[in-house]
């Protein structure tokens, strides 16, 4: 991550799932886009894509680079599509009609 790197050193009280997901998100670099399913699998929780999305929506101020995570079709988060698109574009990612263009999974 860039200067927006999350400060998640104090993870006391977090579940193992939350800590595992945070560790994956901490490794994402500027301009890197992944799917919810990829985050779940990399965190050791394959099949938990919805839980990753739920976590990101429940903890919006936790310092996660949530804007770098999209659906398998490249679709942006519905409740914050504009902000997510702006952040991704600022990192050089092409976003067209609410989707990350060129996402090949």
Task: Describe each PLM feature range.
Residues 2-105:
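Nucleic acid-binding interface residues in structured DNA/RNA-binding domains
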């Amino acid at each position: 991550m860039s200067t927006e790197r999350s400060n998640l050193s104090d993870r006391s009280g977090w579940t193992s799932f939350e800590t595992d997901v945070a560790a994956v998100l901490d490794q994402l670099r500027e301009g890197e886009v992944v799917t919810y399913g990829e985050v779940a699998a990399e965190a050791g929780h394959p099949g938990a894509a919805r839980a990753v999305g739920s976590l990101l929506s429940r903890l919006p101020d936790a310092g996660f680079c949530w804007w770098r995570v999209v659906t398998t079709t490249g679709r942006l988060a519905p409740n914050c599509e504009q902000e997510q698109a702006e952040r991704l574009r600022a990192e050089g990612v092409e976003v067209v009609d609410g989707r990350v263009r060129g996402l090949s999974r």
